[in-house]
Amino acid sequence: IVHPQAKLDATVQVGPYAVIDRRVEIGAHCKIGPHVYLTGVTPIGANNRFHAGCVIGDAPQDLKYQDEPTRLRIGDQNVFREHVTVHRSNKLAEATLVGSHNFFMAGSHVAHNCHVGNHAILANGATLGGHATVQDRAFISGNCLVHQFCRVGTLAIMQGGSAISKDLPPFTVARGD
């Protein structure tokens, strides 16, 4: 189901039972899998792939949110595997930002107002709390948790099952115990 006001490039492929709301804009050569829900004020760049069950641009999970048309911006050549969720910002003056060439594995979550750089990887079940930042080429392993307002630096690695509640500097490794 594609809303008549949604803007899709002519090369976009849309799978069965996908829902694309009116304020979504999708760039060239994107592939939208079955049962994907794209909503909110969400401009999406070129060559992105959304696998089955993704929910992209839905309202933030924040009690302060007042049903405003907040934003999520997605760059080019990202992969969103099965059941990935990415929420839009909780304030009109800000946006949730996803750069380019990122890989979001199944079940990963990007909360409101997060900034994800370029070439980052979030493995299965990785979760970013609100306002978190993931810099370029960071690797967040399976079932890792990044607390709200924390930053994961460039080329930093979080090993499987780790959680951080403080910034992880660039070029470092966090290990869960």
Which sequence ranges carry the predicted segments?
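Structural signal for interior beta-strand "rungs" in well-ordered beta-sheet cores
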Residues: 1-174
